[in-house]
Amino acid sequence: RKAVLADVEAIVKLVNMAYRGESSRSGWTTEADILDGLRTSVNEVERLIASENTIVLLCLNDDELLGSICLEKEAKIEKALSIAHIGMFVVNPMKQANGIGKRLLAEAERLAQHMWDIEKFQMHVITIRPELIAFYERRGYMLTGIVSDFPVNPDVWQPKLDGLQLETLEKIISK
């Protein structure tokens, strides 16, 4: 289901637990050896949920939050493909490797295509995460060769390694 403001605390807790710190090490998506600090904040998730161009989708088992994913619709430029950016994609580390992420990503793509008529999905992945890049490649995403420096945000996170970079991956949807 789509997230609402009442879900913010649970989303922030799950995202930070899955990406950073010791709790993230039980899953394969940890960034604990790459980054210190938080992955997200209450303010960021509230802003995303409140935005009309964003969907935060939740995966629940009864009331247990298993995963979430954020889709942000890019403003369409004349004759360009309509694009949705995927981010803050997470599955509880204790529940990973059970197909939840595959199903959540597929449902997010389906929903974005239905609601926004999306023709291309984009995301940014840390270049030193080959296992994560491979996961997305198996789902039809391709490396674009577009690489950028990892963003600096010392109030929230701090890189443990110098020279971190992000690569843009994309998936074009045939109509």
Describe each model-derived feature in a short phrase.
Residues 58, 89-97, 125-126:
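A short, internal acetyl-CoA/4′-phosphopantetheine-binding micro-motif in the GNAT/acyltransferase core
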Residues 39-57, 162-165:
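A short helix-loop-beta-strand connector motif used in the catalytic cores of GNAT acetyltransferases and
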